[in-house]
Swiss-Prot record:
Pathway as given in its UniProt record: Cofactor biosynthesis; NAD(+) biosynthesis; quinolinate from iminoaspartate: step 1/1
Catalytic activity reported: iminosuccinate + dihydroxyacetone phosphate = quinolinate + phosphate + 2 H2O + H(+)
Name assigned to this protein: Quinolinate synthase
Recorded GO CC terms: cytosol
Gene coding for it: nadA
Native organism: Staphylococcus carnosus (strain TM300)
Length: 366
């Protein structure tokens, strides 16, 4: 499992912290110009604007996975995202291409909620004690080790953008799905496909307990008890209060939100879906968005002819995504020029082989 404390070997030199924003921007741009097409900088939508301005492409997890796989020209990928995204890029790209993460402490709390030891134990209990024929699926927000586990057992990765297609595929395999590590995306997707809540269970990896209310024989999906630390901060009460103030308000949320929030919202979908919905919204319409704050603020700045706010007025940005900043980006690019490999993310060959199977299966389904 990724351990940000063990992964960080050196503190950022003080000189980068002392540089002005203009100096950092000029330094970064100069290196981009120098390296040209040898450098590629995929950047997640949740990044802040100071980083997004240098992106060669912005996207959600599915878009970035596809783009990295298709790019055979770049020698260096500087991934402005979090650790599991850089791992995914390494798995999908050629061995001759290096993947850099500007700050090695940019992890993901959701991915850390399912380590491989827990997954193997949970699988054994579900298959041996409860006699369930399990097909595992994992959200791409997971470690390479979890993706390997899923690939070895014939399963697939999913993203919020293709979860419905992949879960539908899995349901048609005649097995019980084990959905890692985000219970909310799994529950919302399965329910949207017509699976009632009583045919869902939750596996608690800490208590080592299977929680269900219906008949065990009717189970269609077991949800890993994990969640996104950002999207869990949106609640149905936020929607209720907003509609009391403004009955005409439009509410759109990410499916990583709790089931009650998704059911109460007017719209729910992936990051790409949210962006496209806001882009095509009628002028003068009013929107509350339940997703990461950097993206909400960027949409608010971009589409000024509609009213946009966060569903939770006290919301903050994703803390680990925000670890990627101009000083770390400049430092990382200097390391590339110096031949320093400290920030390279490399997945071992055996893990990458089976993890790639789960990723390729996802891409073939969708």
């Amino acid at each position: 499992m990724f351990n940000p404390i063990l992964s960080v070997s050196k503190s950022i030199p003080e000189k980068y912290l002392q540089m002005s924003q203009e100096e950092l921007e000029n330094h970064i741009q100069a290196i981009k110009d120098q390296l040209g097409n040898r450098l590629f900088m995929p950047t997640h939508h949740y990044q802040k604007n100071e980083v997004v301005q240098f992106a060669d492409i912005t996207g959600d997890s599915l878009e970035l996975a596809r783009i990295c796989k298709e790019n055979t020209e770049a020698e260096y990928f500087v991934f402005n995202g979090v650790h599991f995204m850089a791992e995914t890029a390494d798995i999908l790209t050629d061995d001759s291409q290096d993947i850099y993460l500007p700050d090695l402490s940019a992890g993901c709390s959701m991915a850390d909620m399912a380590n491989i030891t827990q997954a193997l134990h949970g699988y054994d209990v579900l298959t041996e004690k409860f006699h369930l024929d399990i097909l595992p699926l994992t959200y791409v927000n997971s470690t390479a080790a979890i993706k390997k586990f899923v690939g070895e057992h014939g399963g697939s990765c999913v993203t919020s953008g293709n979860a419905k297609s992949v879960v539908d595929w899995a349901l048609n395999q005649g097995k019980v799905i084990l959905f890692l590590p985000d219970q909310h995306l799994g529950r919302n997707t399965a329910y949207d496909l017509g699976i009632p809540l009583e045919q869902m269970a939750v596996w608690d990896p800490i208590a080592k307990e299977l929680i269900y209310e219906g008949d065990l024989e009717d189970l269609r999906i077991v949800l890993w008890k994990g969640h996104c630390s950002v999207h869990e901060k949106f609640h149905k009460a936020h929607i209720d209060m907003a509609r009391e103030r403004d009955p005409e308000i439009n509410v759109i949320v990410h499916p990583e939100c709790e089931f009650e929030v998704v059911q109460a919202a007017d719209y729910a979908g992936s990051t790409r879906y949210i962006i496209e919905t806001i882009k095509n919204a009628p002028k003068g319409s009013r929107w509350l968005i339940g997703t990461e704050m950097n993206l909400v603020n960027r949409l608010k700045e971009t589409y000024t002819d509609i009213t946009i706010d966060s569903l939770n007025p006290l919301m903050c940005s994703c803390l680990t995504m925000n670890r990627i900043d101009l000083p770390h980006l400049a430092w990382c690019l200097d390391k590339i020029l110096d031949g320093n490999k400290d920030n390279i993310i490399k997945v071992d060959a055996e893990t990458a082989k089976y993890a790639k199977e789960s990723l390729d299966r996802m891409l073939s389904i969708t």
